[in-house]
Amino acid sequence: MAVDPFACPMMTMQRKPEVHDAFREAGPVVEVNAPAGGPAWVITDDALAREVLADPRFVKDPDLAPAAWRGVDDGLDIPVPELRPFTLIAVDGEAHRRLRRIHAPAFNPRRLAERTDRIAAIAGRLLTELADASGRSGKPAELIGGFAYHFPLLVICELLGVPVTDPAMAREAVSVLKALGLGGPQSGGGDGTDPAGGVPDTSALESLLLEAVHSARRNDTPTMTRVLYERAQAEFGSVSDDQLVYMITGLIFAGHDTTGSFLGFLLAEVLAGRLAADADEDAVSRFVEEALRYHPPVPYTLWRFAATEVTIGGVRLPRGAPVLVDIEGTNTDGRHHDAPHAFHPDRPSWRRLTFGDGPHYCIGEQLAQLESRTMIGVLRSRFPEARLAVPYDELRWCRKGAQTARLTELPVWLR
């Protein structure tokens, strides 16, 4: 293609990358050059994308990736071999179904709803601290680094029983996980070294994670980690501390990184006045749905690979072919949405792939939705006159490779 799907230009809020429209014009299955070299294929059609995401011939197994690819630097997640059965994003088939059975009870909507007050308290505390600091400095609060990522990180740690209680601890935990390559695609070296050089000190984080695991074994409190422990015991017969730590480490990153990216965009839309002051709960839910369609935090799915030679959309793919689904492109397809490139929270319905589809559908969707609605409620009740400190059109966002999209900053007057 003439356009690079993996380019990372700086964009404005009202400008979307042209590559997605170009993909649709090129066809339902488009061959591109992968970042690490060699061919890859992007699925651009909504129906075909859902077919691929549900097709057992397309798998997440990183062993099928081209030999030249280098782990997380190329958008892969390659777990420690003995721990692979405990990571949702790198196994398929019955191994994946077993992990879903272990994780699903922890994300039960009723169980999550019971924690709404605690989630609201975390949002309120963070926003109040930012407002107080803004009042002292006379400068607007910066909600990307100061809130959007810290909020979901502190929430998932609270739910798991990991005693990360303040933003400073959260930042340290994230830096260690990224340095170890446990932060998801394109997050770090993946070899136990910091991308800037050196070996990070993991002892403090390991202590916190083990504290959550040991508490779960004692059944001190009804945390997500306790649920994972009970279900893993039932499925595997026994589960080690290392295995539990690996599971909750994956949830910490999955539970905050993409959510943090999305919350930045959602906050921008709320603070730009797109949500009516008298919006009820249903209106807030519709607003969140439209933001999920319009601002997917990941423009493409994680890589999948053809487990065998397969023909899809009239295109024959060889065994091992790397495949992406164009989430943002399908979300803004004019065949499914009126005015697809406009933000309209009153749309009668949504068709989106923001959380994926098929067996690997995001297990944390309900938590992300709850965090989004709760955050809006806290912001509107505590700071009813909050507003952007810069014009909406001056906000900038960019992509980190093919896997995440995020605002660079979000200066706000919290009043």
Curated annotation (Swiss-Prot):
Keywords assigned by UniProt, alphabetized: Antibiotic biosynthesis, Cytoplasm, Heme, Iron, Metal-binding, Monooxygenase, NADP, Oxidoreductase
One GO process term, biological-process aspect: daunorubicin biosynthetic process
Record flagged with keyword NADP: yes
One Pfam short name: p450
Subcellular location: Cytoplasm
Keyword Cell membrane: no
Pathway in which the depicted protein is active: Antibiotic biosynthesis; daunorubicin biosynthesis; Antibiotic biosynthesis; carminomycin biosynthesis
E.C. number(s) listed in UniProt: 1.14.13.181
Catalytic activity of the protein: 13-deoxydaunorubicin + NADPH + O2 + H(+) = 13-dihydrodaunorubicin + NADP(+) + H2O; 13-dihydrodaunorubicin + NADPH + O2 + H(+) = daunorubicin + NADP(+) + 2 H2O; 13-deoxycarminomycin + NADPH + O2 + H(+) = 13-dihydrocarminomycin + NADP(+) + H2O; 13-dihydrocarminomycin + NADPH + O2 + H(+) = carminomycin + NADP(+) + 2 H2O
Record-level GO cellular component terms: cytoplasm
GO molecular function: heme binding; iron ion binding; oxidoreductase activity, acting on paired donors, with incorporation or reduction of molecular oxygen, NAD(P)H as one donor, and incorporation of one atom of oxygen
Required cofactor(s): heme
Binding site for heme: 362
SUPFAM superfamilies: Cytochrome P450 (SSF48264)
Record's function text: Involved in the biosynthesis of the anthracyclines carminomycin and daunorubicin (daunomycin) which are aromatic polyketide antibiotics that exhibit high cytotoxicity and are widely applied in the chemotherapy of a variety of cancers.
Misc. remarks from the entry: S.peucetius ATCC 29050 produces significant quantities of doxorubicin only when it grows in a highly-buffered doxorubicin production medium. S.peucetius subsp. caesius ATCC 27952, a mutant strain derived from S.peucetius ATCC 29050, is the only organism reported to produce doxorubicin in vivo.
UniProt similarity note: Belongs to the cytochrome P450 family.
Quaternary assembly: Monomer.
Name of protein: Cytochrome P-450 monooxygenase DoxA
